Amino acid sequence: MPVRRYKPVTSSTRHRVVIDYKSVITKTEPEKSLLAPLKKSGGRNNAGRISVRFRGGGHKRRYRIIDFKRDKDGIPGKITSIEYDPNRTAFIALVTYADGEKRYILAPDEIEVGDVIISGEEAPIRVGNALPLSKIPTGTTIHNIELYPGRGGQLVRSAGTWAQLMAKEGDYAHVRLPSGEIRLINVKCKATIGRVSNLDHENVSSGKAGRTRWLGRRPQVRGTAMNPVDHPHGGGEGKSPIGHPSPLSPWGWKTLGWKTRRGKKPSDKFIVKRRK
């Protein structure tokens, strides 16, 4: 998938690298029946307090209802269009099934308009098809993986990512995730064959602060530039050191390398190898 690099005509185009959407997107208007309103939170929770810092503003969006469950087993569907989704890094594909129903799915890499996909235990091993892990050969590249049967895909959904089915042992399959973690997942859980689309997303550079603001992201202020009341690194005269043996988060936790995962989680028994 090509990217567009701009000539340095202005300071904002000097480092700008964007996805060449015209070479990928086949339809600009979304399917109205698969849209839902999406209200902005500005990073606030139900109490009105900031729960995620540096969020707010951005262009208005409508949510695209995505079929993560892929539960239309045995019914073939034809890829009608590849579309842009402002709510995720990957592209989405509009699928028209043989019974007339339309659904959005995460667009796998190398999928094209006109391709036919199908889900279910008898589906062939082909890019875009969704099967239980028990029916997928070991070594296959997969994405949109369920954690619990029937809940819908929760793992490996962002642009350009993929996982690999390493082995099967009894009721569980060994899956290597993009982080390097090897995890046990029930073989009844479904996964989609192939990689997620938009592999060049990692090469994108906004080029200017304004493009980041369009996405709803506000400037990230350094802790050393704050007052002591706002951050453990704050205060001091001029460019003074942070005043602590190691860097701290705004809430006083050690950061930059300090492991924050809680010990003795119920899911620990499903992790064969920790992430790198």
UniProtKB/Swiss-Prot annotation:
Keywords: Ribonucleoprotein, Ribosomal protein, RNA-binding, rRNA-binding
UniProt cross-references to Gene3D superfamilies, sorted A to Z: 2.30.30.30, Nucleic acid-binding proteins, Ribosomal protein L2, domain 3
Positions of the UniProt region annotated as Disordered: 203-276
Basic and acidic residues: compositionally biased ranges: 265-276
One protein family per Pfam: Ribosomal_L2
Highest taxon listed in the record's lineage: Bacteria
GO cellular component: large ribosomal subunit
Presence of the UniProt keyword Cytoplasm in the record: no
GO BP: any one term: cytoplasmic translation
Basic residues: bias regions: 210-220
Molecular-function GO terms, alphabetical: rRNA binding; structural constituent of ribosome; transferase activity
InterPro entries assigned: NA-bd_OB-fold, Rib_uL2_dom2, Ribosomal_uL2, Ribosomal_uL2_bac/org-type, Ribosomal_uL2_C, Ribosomal_uL2_CS, Ribosomal_uL2_dom3, Ribosomal_uL2_RNA-bd_dom
Family: Belongs to the universal ribosomal protein uL2 family.
Subunit structure, as described in the record: Part of the 50S ribosomal subunit. Forms a bridge to the 30S subunit in the 70S ribosome.
Function summary: One of the primary rRNA binding proteins. Required for association of the 30S and 50S subunits to form the 70S ribosome, for tRNA binding and peptide bond formation. It has been suggested to have peptidyltransferase activity; this is somewhat controversial. Makes several contacts with the 16S rRNA in the 70S ribosome.
Protein name listed in UniProt: Large ribosomal subunit protein uL2
Organism expressing this protein natively: Coprothermobacter proteolyticus (strain ATCC 35245 / DSM 5265 / OCM 4 / BT)
Taxonomic classification: Bacteria, Pseudomonadati, Coprothermobacterota, Coprothermobacteria, Coprothermobacterales
